Amino acid sequence: MYDLTSAQLDLQARARELAQTKFAPTAAQTDQTEEYPWKNVELLRDAGFMGMTLPKSIGGQGLSYLDAVIVVEEMAKACATMGRITVEANMGAIGAIAKYGTPEQLKIAADLVLAGDKPAICISEPNAGSAASEMTTRADRQGDHYIINGEKYWITGGGVSKVHLIFARVLEDGVDQGIGGFICVRDGENSPAGLVIGRRLYAMGVRGIPETHIEFHDLKVHKSMLVVPPGGLKRGFASLMTAYNAQRVGAGTVALGIAQGAFEEGLERLKTRHQFGRPIAEFQGLQWMAADMSTQLEAARLLLRHAAASGEEFPDIDKAARAKIFAAETANKVTNDALQFWGSSGYGRENPMERHVRDARMFTIAGGTAQILRTQVAGKLLGMKLPQTRDGFAKVAAR
């Protein structure tokens, strides 16, 4: 259904060459040190794989989300951290800014992304994860500025990202106007007064990107940096969720890439490992496991590419949800089954299989849990709304 064009095959080949020669050899080190791979990010930037979905008029390549997932899969297959960075530099916050921001806002963000920045999107809070609309971070209008107070949780890239897209409840004269989004820029190690990078949350997998708390203490943001105004059907929180569909497809593709890499490594082990005096590939039970894994991976790939190509500006919300559910759960199963081909040696830290299992585990949680996405899909099928409460402002006012 999605035979790649000659241009896409060339794009895939270039991505694979970079990923396998530069990122795969350092993937274990990135996992062990848990340090942000600055040198690899520079290589990614120099190859033109950051900001590639941005319009040509501002320095991007004008590539589609389908093009982007082709690249993301290759990066994630080599190194999960580089796969996630590729998503965030092409399919995350930058997509929302490109769609809803002013030309001036887009230039600020695009220039930094094209220079190698991975934007951070600040949504989740300690008590507002899947129920994101219950966020209590507030932005009070004071003249030409908004004063932001609150905290965010599990922010990918906290401490390394320059561009931050911060979502908060907007208050005008003390009245809740709904959720809006603001651009705030960190300059290297220097944060604007009031933006505090909190403690790092050490993760089970995909360890090369820091996940942190971020706190806002009277952070002052000019009104010109309000990129997603609150209220209205196509504004505020609704706009965010539409733009977020691309990030979900990207996250699912990272899971796919991790699983594809694990499968290929497991398949080689299946061919070369001997037990009971013969190759274990001769055992029908393992043959069927391999056949199922291959089928599941191909199905996930087709769902993700179908979702990436859907929609006029962003992937269709339901197609994105279905694709991410299936890809993430497939990745968890395939990585575990691939480890099984290795036996006890696959469980050891010197073997990449245990890293693949840990990396894949993230994706049934991050970017929308498998359960909340199922609720979303079911809600559309049954004509029901998500079970989100509407008392977010009551919590804000009580702070």
UniProtKB/Swiss-Prot annotation:
<dbReference type="InterPro" id="IPR009075">
    <property type="entry name" value="AcylCo_DH/oxidase_C"/>
</dbReference>
<keyword id="KW-0274">FAD</keyword>
<feature type="site" description="Important for activity">
    <location>
        <position position="84"/>
    </location>
</feature>
<feature type="binding site">
    <location>
        <begin position="153"/>
        <end position="156"/>
    </location>
    <ligand>
        <name>FAD</name>
    </ligand>
</feature>
<feature type="binding site">
    <location>
        <begin position="367"/>
        <end position="371"/>
    </location>
    <ligand>
        <name>FAD</name>
    </ligand>
</feature>
<dbReference type="GO" id="GO:0003995">
    <property type="term" value="F:acyl-CoA dehydrogenase activity"/>
</dbReference>
<dbReference type="Pfam" id="PF00441">
    <property type="entry name" value="Acyl-CoA_dh_1"/>
</dbReference>
<feature type="binding site">
    <location>
        <position position="130"/>
    </location>
    <ligand>
        <name>FAD</name>
    </ligand>
</feature>
<feature type="binding site">
    <location>
        <begin position="244"/>
        <end position="245"/>
    </location>
    <ligand>
        <name>substrate</name>
    </ligand>
</feature>
<keyword id="KW-0378">Hydrolase</keyword>
<feature type="binding site">
    <location>
        <position position="273"/>
    </location>
    <ligand>
        <name>FAD</name>
    </ligand>
</feature>
<dbReference type="GO" id="GO:0016787">
    <property type="term" value="F:hydrolase activity"/>
</dbReference>
<dbReference type="InterPro" id="IPR006091">
    <property type="entry name" value="Acyl-CoA_Oxase/DH_mid-dom"/>
</dbReference>
<dbReference type="GO" id="GO:0046359">
    <property type="term" value="P:butyrate catabolic process"/>
</dbReference>
<keyword id="KW-0285">Flavoprotein</keyword>
<dbReference type="InterPro" id="IPR036250">
    <property type="entry name" value="AcylCo_DH-like_C"/>
</dbReference>
<dbReference type="InterPro" id="IPR013786">
    <property type="entry name" value="AcylCoA_DH/ox_N"/>
</dbReference>
<feature type="binding site">
    <location>
        <position position="340"/>
    </location>
    <ligand>
        <name>FAD</name>
    </ligand>
</feature>
<dbReference type="InterPro" id="IPR050032">
    <property type="entry name" value="AcdA"/>
</dbReference>
<comment type="subunit">
    <text>Homotrimer or homotetramer.</text>
</comment>
<feature type="binding site">
    <location>
        <begin position="121"/>
        <end position="124"/>
    </location>
    <ligand>
        <name>FAD</name>
    </ligand>
</feature>
<dbReference type="Pfam" id="PF02770">
    <property type="entry name" value="Acyl-CoA_dh_M"/>
</dbReference>
<dbReference type="InterPro" id="IPR037069">
    <property type="entry name" value="AcylCoA_DH/ox_N_sf"/>
</dbReference>
<dbReference type="InterPro" id="IPR006089">
    <property type="entry name" value="Acyl-CoA_DH_CS"/>
</dbReference>
<protein>
    <recommendedName>
        <fullName>3-sulfinopropanoyl-CoA desulfinase</fullName>
        <ecNumber>3.13.1.4</ecNumber>
    </recommendedName>
</protein>
<dbReference type="Pfam" id="PF02771">
    <property type="entry name" value="Acyl-CoA_dh_N"/>
</dbReference>
<comment type="function">
    <text>Catalyzes the conversion 3-sulfinopropanoyl-CoA (3SP-CoA) to propanoyl-CoA by abstraction of sulfite. Does not show dehydrogenase activity.</text>
</comment>
<dbReference type="InterPro" id="IPR009100">
    <property type="entry name" value="AcylCoA_DH/oxidase_NM_dom_sf"/>
</dbReference>
<feature type="binding site">
    <location>
        <position position="344"/>
    </location>
    <ligand>
        <name>FAD</name>
    </ligand>
</feature>
<dbReference type="GO" id="GO:0033539">
    <property type="term" value="P:fatty acid beta-oxidation using acyl-CoA dehydrogenase"/>
</dbReference>
<comment type="similarity">
    <text>Belongs to the acyl-CoA dehydrogenase family.</text>
</comment>
<feature type="binding site">
    <location>
        <position position="388"/>
    </location>
    <ligand>
        <name>FAD</name>
    </ligand>
</feature>
<dbReference type="InterPro" id="IPR046373">
    <property type="entry name" value="Acyl-CoA_Oxase/DH_mid-dom_sf"/>
</dbReference>
<dbReference type="GO" id="GO:0050660">
    <property type="term" value="F:flavin adenine dinucleotide binding"/>
</dbReference>
